[in-house]
Regions:
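Extracytosolic ligand-binding ectodomains
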Residues: 1-127
Length: 127
């Protein structure tokens, strides 16, 4: 359901009261999210970012943290970079737009979702 409110010609009243889990909402009031939303809208003709834009933003920082931890150098082979990054990702802990994230031994991202309800055509965070 994330992003449904931004679908062209979608009647947002049809989503009224829908509850969903998503790690990000452009209506979040924290400073980091609002700075991201403003920069995204400025760069994308006022398009509002959804969870997937925020996930993409966060993953770049996670990859940078892993590359730094793995001490990646330009002279390393692709195979060596891949092995070093895979190992380093297990130690990365990121506090990003989509929340606090870490990675499991099998490479899955582990983070807490946030609960939202659609009210008056907007995502409202639930307690």
């Amino acid at each position: 359901m994330d992003g449904i409110l931004g679908v062209e010609n979608f009647n947002t009243s049809l989503a009224e009261g829908v509850m969903l889990l998503t790690p990000f909402s452009a209506t979040s009031e924290d400073e980091k999210s609002q700075a991201f939303v403003k920069a995204y809208e400025d760069a994308n003709k006022d398009e509002v970012p959804n969870q997937f834009a925020a996930d993409t933003y966060d993953v770049i920082y996670a990859m940078k943290a892993a590359a730094d931890a793995a001490e990646i150098t330009p002279d390393m082979s692709n195979e060596d970079i891949s092995a070093a990054m895979s190992e380093a990702m297990l130690s990365v802990e990121l506090d990003g737009l989509t929340g606090k994230a870490k990675w499991t031994e099998d490479g899955e991202c582990d983070k807490e979702p946030k609960a939202f309800e659609i009210q008056d055509g907007a995502y409202v965070e639930m307690e």
